[in-house]
C-alpha cells in the first residue's frame, strides 16, 4: 500500500497524506475506461492501469456509477461497489476477479452518451442503491456511442 499511497516527499522521507480517493489524478489513472457498442448494449470496459486492488477499495461508502442516456433521453445506470448483502452480486467492483472488467447496459439502436463517476455516498437505507445520498463525486470518463450501423 505504502509504495503508491505514501510516495517519497520533496523533503525526504515519505508523504503521509495516504493519497487515494481524494486525489483526482490518482482516481483517473487507476483504470483505462472505454465505451463501445455491442448490438443494442453499451459495453463499458475497465482495464487495470495504476491500481493494485479492486476499484474502488472495499469501503462500502465508495462506488463507481455508470450512467448512460439513450437517443430518447432515457437514463440507465449501474452501481459498481461492495454491497452489504451476500451472494454473487455482493461485490461487482472492477478488478475483483482480474485485470479487466466489462459491464453492459441496454441503450437500444440509437446514439447514446455515457459517464463513469466515482462517488462517495452515505450508506443507502434501502436495497435501491440509486437513492443513496452522494456526498462527493469525480467524473472518470465520458463519451458518445454512435447509432447502430454507424459505428
Question: Model-found features: residue ranges?
Answer:
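Short, conserved sequence motifs used for protein processing/export or organelle targeting and
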Residues: 3, 7-151
Amino acid at each position: 500500500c505504502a509504495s503508491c499511497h505514501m510516495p517519497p516527499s520533496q523533503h525526504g522521507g515519505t508523504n503521509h497524506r495516504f493519497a487515494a480517493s481524494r486525489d483526482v489524478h490518482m482516481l483517473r489513472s487507476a483504470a483505462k475506461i472505454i465505451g463501445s457498442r455491442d448490438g443494442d448494449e453499451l459495453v463499458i470496459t475497465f482495464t487495470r492501469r495504476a491500481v493494485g486492488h479492486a476499484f474502488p477499495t472495499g469501503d462500502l461508502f465508495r462506488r463507481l456509477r455508470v450512467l448512460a442516456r439513450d437517443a430518447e433521453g432515457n437514463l440507465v445506470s449501474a452501481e459498481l461497489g461492495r454491497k452489504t448483502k451476500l451472494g454473487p452480486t455482493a461485490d461487482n467492483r472492477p478488478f475483483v476477479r482480474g485485470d479487466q472488467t466489462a459491464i453492459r447496459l441496454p441503450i437500444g439502436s440509437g446514439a447514446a452518451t455515457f459517464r463513469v463517476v466515482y462517488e462517495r455516498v452515505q450508506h443507502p437505507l434501502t436495497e435501491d442503491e440509486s437513492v443513496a445520498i452522494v456526498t462527493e463525486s469525480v467524473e472518470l470518463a465520458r463519451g458518445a456511442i454512435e447509432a447502430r450501423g454507424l459505428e
